[in-house]
């Protein structure tokens, strides 16, 4: 089982369900932060990037205990955008069942493309209003591709 810290589009619960391939009813989702990082829009794009930023805290969600199949699905989705997992220490925040400020190791998707020009601070609500619907529809099609690739042993 693996812990993942999400900070961008996958904090949209509908998109996360599509990518995991199941309902979030039994998924442990907790508020969390990654210290010394901030999340920004990529300039002139519809997605975010996380960057080192001393003294800042990137807010997001910790997804606890996902299995290998779910991790493979997330990797497929994020890999299409040149993101890779790096293990980091995160801090759980303001959760009912876990102590406040509990440190935890989790994997974080970092983008490898240093050519991206950073835009303004990321805003999930803005993304949901402007791009959420079309992004979810595209994700459904893209995740179907994963199943088709597996069927032909690709």
Predicted regions located by residue number:
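Glycine-aromatic micro-motifs
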Residues: 1-154
């Amino acid at each position: 089982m693996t812990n993942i810290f999400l900070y961008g589009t996958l904090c949209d619960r509908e998109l996360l369900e599509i990518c995991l391939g199941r309902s979030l009813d039994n998924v442990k989702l907790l508020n969390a932060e990654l210290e010394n990082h901030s999340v920004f829009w990529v300039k002139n794009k519809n997605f975010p990037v996380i960057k080192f930023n001393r003294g800042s805290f990137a807010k997001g969600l910790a997804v606890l205990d996902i299995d290998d199949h779910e991790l493979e699905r997330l990797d497929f989705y994020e890999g299409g955008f040149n993101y890779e997992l790096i293990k980091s220490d995160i801090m759980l925040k303001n959760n009912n069942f876990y102590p406040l400020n509990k440190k935890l190791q989790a994997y974080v998707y970092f983008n490898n493309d240093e050519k991206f020009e950073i835009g303004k601070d990321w805003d999930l609500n803005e993304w949901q209003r402007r791009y959420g619907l079309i992004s979810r529809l595209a994700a459904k099609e893209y995740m179907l591709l994963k199943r088709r690739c597996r069927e032909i042993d690709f």
